[in-house]
Amino acid sequence: MEKLTILLLVAAVLMSTQALIQEQRQKAKINLFSKRKPSAERWWGENDRRVFGSCTADEECCFNNCVQAYCFFV
């Protein structure tokens, strides 16, 4: 009976250790994916300038061409 109790305790410790290791791996994967930048952000950089879309000033557009509240590619 004593051996069975010890065996069950060892099994419980091993299972809890395995669960903790898997949880840490999941957190590491989440951190890895959260650090990645979207492809558009990698291509254009981290500025907020637009190629197309609405604007209020030339500085908001990539090509500094805000015409009638819209960025134009020229």
From Swiss-Prot:
Residues 1-19 form the signal peptide. This is Conotoxin Vc6.11. The lineage of its organism: Eukaryota, Metazoa, Spiralia, Lophotrochozoa, Mollusca. Expressed by the venom duct. It is found in: Secreted. It comes from Conus victoriae (Queen Victoria cone). Residues 20-41 form a propeptide. It holds the Pfam family Conotoxin. The presence of a 'disulfide through disulfide knot' structurally defines this protein as a knottin.
